[in-house]
From Swiss-Prot:
Protein name listed in UniProt: Phosphocarrier protein HPr
Phosphoserine PTM sites in chain numbering: S46
Activity control note: Phosphorylation on Ser-46 inhibits the phosphoryl transfer from enzyme I to HPr.
Presence of the UniProt keyword Transcription in the record: no
Record-level GO cellular component terms: cytoplasm
GO biological process, alphabetically ordered: phosphoenolpyruvate-dependent sugar phosphotransferase system
Keywords associated with the record: Cytoplasm, Phosphoprotein, Phosphotransferase system, Sugar transport, Transport
Cited InterPro entries: HPr (IPR050399), HPr-like (IPR000032), HPr-like_sf (IPR035895), PTS_HPr_His_P_site (IPR001020), PTS_HPr_Ser_P_site (IPR002114)
Function: General (non sugar-specific) component of the phosphoenolpyruvate-dependent sugar phosphotransferase system (sugar PTS). This major carbohydrate active-transport system catalyzes the phosphorylation of incoming sugar substrates concomitantly with their translocation across the cell membrane. The phosphoryl group from phosphoenolpyruvate (PEP) is transferred to the phosphoryl carrier protein HPr by enzyme I. Phospho-HPr then transfers it to the PTS EIIA domain.
Active site annotation, chain numbering: H15 (pros-phosphohistidine intermediate)
Organism: Treponema pallidum (strain Nichols)
Similarity comment text for this entry: Belongs to the HPr family.
Coarse class of the protein's main subcellular location: cytoplasm
């Protein structure tokens, strides 16, 4: 299992488009991928779950990945956050 804290850097937060990018990236991997914000824990492969987090700009999320391709999965999703979901 690998765990990393990521921060939402884009101004609009995790709305529909960034949520779709997260789900699309997560779905390419066999690992179980969870996003955690405060007491909310969601499957990163679920568009409704990711959007329900309502993570605004500046929010910190814990990315928890467990499985055979966990390092690659963590890296791919972390890159989305670092690149502000290519919105800015």
């Amino acid at each position: 299992m690998v765990v990393k804290t990521v921060r939402v850097l884009n101004r609009a937060g995790v709305h529909a488009r960034p949520a779709a990018l997260i789900v699309q990236a997560a779905s390419r991997f066999d690992s179980k991928i969870m996003l955690v914000r405060d007491t909310i824990r969601v499957n990163a492969k679920s568009i409704m779950g990711v959007m329900a987090m309502a993570a605004g700009c500046g929010s910190e999320l814990e990315l928890v990945v467990e499985g055979p391709d966990e390092v690659a999965a963590l890296s791919a999703i972390e890159r989305l956050f670092q690149n502000k979901f290519e919105e800015e």
